[in-house]
Amino acid sequence: MTTPDDIKRTIEAGLACEHVAVDGDGQHFQAVIVSAAFEGLSRVKRHQLVYGALGDRIRAEIHALSMQTLTPSERG
């Protein structure tokens, strides 16, 4: 079963992040991701970056992922 820590490590390995927090029950996950890479990007483009970091896991192992994607300045 996929754990929140698995998802966190996968995101961190594929995307330069200042902060990643993931919670979930093994299929449904919620994530807060802070990255300078999100500067100037729409929410859709930000989510696409995260999906890219997750690769095939997003289809095979994760039923649902809710994301809050922020830049460092948006996080405050």
Task: Place the predicted regions along the sequence by residue.
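N-terminal first-folded block
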Residues: 1-27
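C-terminal structural segments of small proteins and small subunits
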Residues: 47-76
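Solvent-exposed beta-strand sheet faces enriched in polar/charged residues
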Residues: 23, 32-34, 68-70
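A short interface-forming secondary-structure element
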Residues: 33-45
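A short acidic, often aromatic-flanked loop/helix-cap motif at beta-alpha or helix-coil junctions
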Residues: 28-30, 75-76
